[in-house]
Amino acid sequence: MSQEVLEDLAKVRNIGIMAHIDAGKTTTTERILFYTGITHKIGEVHDGAAAMDWMAQEQERGITITSAATTCFWGGNQINIIDTPGHVDFTVEVERSLRVLDGAVAVFDGKEGVEPQSETVWRQADKYKVPRICFVNKMDKIGADFHFTVKTVVDRLGATPLVIQLPIGSESTFEGVIDLVEMRALTWRGDAKGDVKMGAEYAVEPIPEDLKQQADEFRQKLIETVAENDEALLEKFFSGEEITVAELKSAIRRLTVSGSLYPILCGSSFKNRGVQPMLDAVVDYLPSPLDVPPVTGVDADNPQERLADVSQPFSALAFKVAVHPFFGRLTYIRVYSGTLPAGSQIVNSTKSRKERFGKVFQMHSNKENPVPKMSAGHIYAVIGLKYTTTGDTLCDQDNPIILESMTFPDPVIEVAIEPKTKADQEKLSLAIQRLAEEDPTFKTEQNPETGQTVIKGMGELHLDILVDRMRREFNVEANVGTPQVAYRETIRRTVEKHEYTHKKQTGGAGQFARVIITLEPLEVTGEKTYDFVDTVTGGRIPKEYIPSVDAGIRDAMQVGVLAGYPTVGIKATLVDGAYHDVDSSEMAFRIAGSQAFKEASRRADPTLLEPIMSVEVRTPDEYMGDVIGDLNSRRGHIQSMQDSSGIKVIQARVPLSEMFGYIGDLRSKTSGRAVYSMTFDGYAEAPKSVTEEVVRKARGE
């Protein structure tokens, strides 16, 4: 089959593989590439040679950090795969890949079931309404339990699973699956070391006698579940007619695409069993670009949509920028509509800049296959885009549209970084600029007082890897400080009608602005941390100056009155004020707004907020007391404790400032047998002792 891009979109699948760390996601992707004939020797993550893990650190750490996009062919269909990382510090990668996928394969560990990170990724996929099929991997592992894993999909994700395969054998005797749709057994029989043919061939057999009864029960359940959700089949089901395989498949497809059900398959990627049927399921049940609702523009006054069709005007979303060793900036884009040859000029409608595409590639991990043009429904990597960053829309100059972008969380941890020599200084700023283009959750700023460069990210591992990349890719030698917590400030009390007058009379034009503001605490939500209300009547402050007061307050909120951290949770009401015909200006009102806020917030009982992390620890029973005692000593609140296949799962909320270096302590307390994961949960008021300590440090006492 030629490697050209398929024009028939019904035969195209854009999918992601999502999972918890170590559920076997990269291995699964490797097997897919092997069976679809792109990689000749299977890369094993165990020896650090997987084709998808192409950054040096990924190969060392055995975890996937960047989502490499890969194209492969299966049975006349084209599958574009985006491999996503499962480590919580890399949520941004998962978030951006889900935004451009049409469907996903959720890989679960057959022994652990749904783990905390699988849950986070699952919720992100819910947010973008991505249809999914589930693959229960590692069925050859000791303690693997298919039915337990299916139960965790119900209990922890609240999803409706649809079991379409059952395992034949388990642990070391796992040798195949029962296909409940076509009622047959698929077996991969090899020698004890695993088949020399890499499991590329499998036998289709009748279902073994000892499993027939179980298979019949599950087949009945499968048909009932599908019929309940699909009217066409419901009538047939009640009238006792035979439902054909084709009818069952198309009903499962409809329900999967609409997100009502999640088909569940099983296998062992490492032992090369069960991967081909999973590829068949990707083609059979996951949506093509034609099954997905058309994309719409975000401009409410001018609603527009684009269908996945080459005859429509061109539109695409940039979802990743990577730095390539030869080509420089490589931008990954998902084309939603239209077609364009390489070298065309387009508009970046998000930034209102003209751009030109250079060469266009379909990627295989980090090898490029050049293609002459881009067309709807596909994923490409392009070079030549100068201004485009993650989340920008690219479109036809005459038919502009802006597509929904992605939301990225604010960083929660920061470290100061200093170049070791003068020569490193320039390299450092280039490295930071390049890395920030690639990763929107990586922020950087100059500390005005110390002149230090501060880098911010989503966790210790995230920053470690970024500093590591600076060293490897940009040869920057730098000293890194200890991690600091990104605190916030807020107010606890309402201050009514605080007045501030800004005036300056020094010959020539003076400056004059009077404002009266009321400050109230505002509940902080993900989207809203500040609200500005204007209740000035009778033109006491001319309309054109009011945005300046708002801007002044925003300026002042950047540096809080307690310890200089950004202020959140403020509702500011501009009640009244006064102006002068000659001396008032936007600048004067901006200064007045800023100073009024500073004075009022000092009176409003300011307090410090600290980031709280949601921590989940999985530990063997005998260490449970130590682990809980340790979490309590870190000011943690234990939320729940559960049993999960011989392991205790502890959920707690712990302040981030207490979690530095936790991994080392946990390892030594549990002889390396416990694991933990941590996600940002929100901000909470810091206790008095912590606030005093932070304020003292900030004031340099």
From Swiss-Prot:
This is Elongation factor G. Catalyzes the GTP-dependent ribosomal translocation step during translation elongation. During this step, the ribosome changes from the pre-translocational (PRE) to the post-translocational (POST) state as the newly formed A-site-bound peptidyl-tRNA and P-site-bound deacylated tRNA move to the P and E sites, respectively. Catalyzes the coordinated movement of the two tRNA molecules, the mRNA and conformational changes in the ribosome. The keyword Phosphoprotein does not apply. It comes from Tropheryma whipplei (strain Twist) (Whipple's bacillus). SUPFAM superfamilies: EF-G C-terminal domain-like, P-loop containing nucleoside triphosphate hydrolases, Ribosomal protein S5 domain 2-like, Translation proteins. Transmembrane segments: none annotated. GO terms for molecular function: GTP binding; GTPase activity; translation elongation factor activity. Its main location: cytoplasm. GO terms for biological process: ribosome disassembly. Keywords: Cytoplasm, Elongation factor, GTP-binding, Nucleotide-binding, Protein biosynthesis. The lineage of its organism: Bacteria, Bacillati, Actinomycetota, Actinomycetes, Micrococcales. GTP binds at residues 19-26, 83-87, 137-140.
